[in-house]
Amino acid sequence: MAESSAATQSPSVSSSSSGAEPSTLGGGGGSPGACPALGAKSCGSSCAVGLSSLCSDEPPSKIMTSSFLSSSEIYNPDPTTPLGSETLGSHLVAKDGKDPLVLLDKKTLDSPQGTNKDRVDTPVSLAADIPCSHPSIPDSFPEQPTFLSKETDPTEEWVVKNQEPKNPSEVPSGEDRSALDLGQRKAEHICTHSLSPSEPAVASVEKDSPESPFEVIIDKATFDREFKDLYKESTDDLGGWAAHGDRESPADLLEMNDKVFPLRNKEAGRYPSSALLGRQFSHTTAALEEVSRCVNDMHNFTNEILTWDLDPQAKQQADKSPCTTESTGLDRSEHRSEIPVINLKTSPQQKMPVCSFNGSTPITRSTGDWTETFTEGKPVKGYLSSTKEAGGKGVPDSSQPISGSGAATVEVTLPDLRGTWPNSVLGEVTEVDSSGESDDTVIEDTTENPSVKNNKVLPEKSDSLPSAAVKTSERENKETTSHETVRSEMYENSEQQQAHAETPTQRSLEGQMSPQVPNMLNEVIPENLAMTDTTRVCSAAPPSVLSETGFSLTVPASAKSESLLGKNVEDTDGSSPEDLMAALTGTEEKGTVDKEKGDVLEAVLEKIANVKNTLPVELLHENKLSSSETKNTKSKYSEHSRETNGGAPKVSSDLEQEQLTIRAIKELGAKQVQAERMSPGGKLKRTFDPQSGPQNSSDILEHTDITTGSDLGIPKKPTIIKDTRIDSISSLTKTETVNKHVLARLLSDFPVHDLIFWRDVKKTGFVFGTTLIMLLSLAAFSVISVVSYLILALLSVTISFRVYKSVIQAVQKSEEGHPFKAYLDVDITLSSEAFHSYMNAAMVHVNKALKLIIRLFLVEDLVDSLKLAVFMWLMTYVGAVFNGITLLILAELLVFSVPIVYEKYKTQIDHYVGIARDQTKSIVEKIQAKLPGIAKKKAE
């Protein structure tokens, strides 16, 4: 509420014009009233309400605030004005002999927090039961100010009905001196703001000067004596304001009190000199030039952006109708100012209020996109009702008032829908039903579909959630401009709906799409805009989505619809042949609806960007569908009506529509897709060829294969073929394959089978002898000694051979080079793939061994654990007789002897082995039968 309190202090003269808080004088930091061209001390309190007066055609002597109210001319022409409504300026003329009153800090009780800080023109608003101070304007004020309107609320009368004209010589009462004591600490600074700041303070009191109608109380003691008592009363009165503010702190109240002091007649005594008037009159020309120059620069920059040709093929446009908007604030018919009053020190992304709905909620607009020209010569109509008229040239009955309690009227002229979209960003004019229950109701930057039927006025839900204004990114602009031709075709088809939608609740709102409104891209729509249960395309979907979806789907108004990711899309209305054809010809873009609460259009654009090189089939990747489903607006609504009534539609070959669709896809820069024509028998079929497109696209999650027979009376659901191009080999299968591969390499490189079966006697003998000698050496010597001897033997052989070859080459004078050069050039590096393959092979055995050990030691099976125990008990006796090396020697002997013996006596060995196996099995069964746990296990 600190911003609100600061924004409403503009009707009174401020004492903090010395630069203490220049940003709060005109409506909070960054508000247009801050008057940056005048410097830190240039913005006084009397111009804090509307700096647009500074930019108007009025002479400097008429630049006054719109907050001075005359006690003799306050009347209410219409007693139906609700409390809290805003008066858009008051034509109040001060009369001679009477002391006009200034309503101090006229605040609106139902004004939401954070809305006043963005206002361009702070309208004079009044709320009941608010204690106010009544400073006056002297009779000798130069050229009585002319204000904007003579309409006030009936609630204003209670503030001024008891005020009597003051005698110029009468001593000021307590109500007149209420707030001057707060400004006593700043009286010296006020004196220095006269036309001659270098002169002494006494010289600044100009009683006869037309530019200095006020007098300065130089004597601080006199100031305290006159205004001390009434300051306390005013402090008590202003203290009651805390009951009307939601979250006003004492610091905020002190800030309000510190900026206000009343004005008195010159004849009645001492008056503080208005530093603002002196500086305002002396710097009016400079301020006008500076503000005009900065605003013109901003307009030029914005117009240059808007004229960028992002898509050369989007030049085919119809005549554009200007979108003119009448804004609240100063009377444009009187001032005829086309320069919007903005704060030039703020960021270009600052939101500027254009008009107010429900008396408090502004429609914000970015100052960087401000290209709107205020309507001249037309007074703002309809102060007592908030309406927004959207009239389309070619769309009858598209002007829809929405009831409300605001005091702003915005008239928008919309173009014919048969024109194509502009080559810049798409504009949007939408209806807003603001109930005032949302503090920061804004409008999301979404596109309204022309197929929406909502002529019936519906109130907004009271539990509307505040939504944040979505900034339009450059990628969104480019994506929007690249789909203009498709939208143009859709709107030509949507014109046919006029003949089939005549009910009051199904009037088309096609006129709400304006190509002349690129500057309204940040204009906001409440997320909970009430709508009827009619089919429409979700506003979050881009134009390409609308042209690609080939299924007539219903749009639930509830925001809690379940997500349909990966499910079949239900064709609730029945798919017409036109819909199926549009679904088949559209390609490479997903019909996506991602209506999440902040991040709506970016997800859709990412999905579309990922699908540039996908299969030439219709992709219905519905990602997190949370509020509505998609509907194809390219289908003809006459056939849609017949489907709804139960009639069986007939398939008619529409070659022209197919060609238009293909041409639109070409203009979008996508791949050309050859659409199949319908057969004479009325059979429309498109088969899914998994080899027809690139197979390396991992973004495709689902493909739709739509096939319809000759009897299209019964709507068929699209068959969704899930893309299973993922490697079908599981991790276990891959590991087994690697194992087989490694074993095959080992068997091929080292023929173990041939080696142990003595296929090559020399090779087998060499290997057998070497290993046996090494094992015998390990039995006789230590491991270190054996390894050292082996290395010495190897080196002795290689060195001897190297020296021998060198001697031979020296004797023969040959250049054969190194004798081991062929072996030195061999690449024996182990690649990461090979290492991983070996590790995978080893890990299989390691994991198997670990699992077996856990099973045995944790007694998963009692018999297996007992077997291990018996084996280990026998090994204790073996270890007492043999050591490890001896066992290895015996194992080698068996390896090189048993296979060849078994090969020779296989039949006899198999017979005796079978007998031994049967005997062992019978013994094990007898043991298991006597154990208690085993019997229960078998019974189970």
From Swiss-Prot:
Present in olfactory bulb, olfactory epithelium and retina (at protein level). It holds the Pfam family Reticulon. InterPro entries: Reticulon (IPR003388), RTN1-4 (IPR046964). GO terms for cellular component: endoplasmic reticulum; endoplasmic reticulum membrane; glutamatergic synapse; Golgi apparatus; Golgi membrane; neuron projection; postsynaptic density; presynapse. The keyword Endoplasmic reticulum applies. Residues 908-910 are annotated as: Interaction with BACE1. GO terms for biological process: apoptotic process; brain development; endoplasmic reticulum tubular network formation; endoplasmic reticulum tubular network organization; negative regulation of amyloid-beta formation; neuron differentiation; vesicle-mediated transport. Gene3D superfamilies: 1.20.5.2480. Residues 491-512, 689-699 have a biased composition (Polar residues). Residues 472-490 have a biased composition (Basic and acidic residues). Residues 772-795, 853-875, 880-902 dip into the membrane without crossing it. It is a multi-pass membrane protein. The modification N-acetylalanine is found at A2. Residues 2-771, 796-852, 876-879, 903-940 are cytoplasmic. It is found in: Endoplasmic reticulum membrane; Golgi apparatus membrane. Keywords: Acetylation, Apoptosis, Endoplasmic reticulum, ER-Golgi transport, Golgi apparatus, Membrane, Phosphoprotein, Transmembrane, Transmembrane helix, Transport. The modification Phosphoserine is found at S31, S196, S204, S209, S212, S249, S282, S508, S575, S576, S652. Signal peptide: none annotated. The modification Phosphothreonine is found at T572. May be involved in membrane trafficking in the early secretory pathway. Inhibits BACE1 activity and amyloid precursor protein processing. May induce caspase-8 cascade and apoptosis. May favor BCL2 translocation to the mitochondria upon endoplasmic reticulum stress. Induces the formation of endoplasmic reticulum tubules. Acts also as an inflammation-resolving regulator by interacting with both TRIM25 and RIGI, subsequently impairing RIGI 'Lys-63'-linked polyubiquitination leading to IRF3 and NF-kappa-B inhibition. PANTHER family: RETICULON-3, RETICULON-LIKE PROTEIN. This is Reticulon-3. It comes from Rattus norvegicus (Rat).
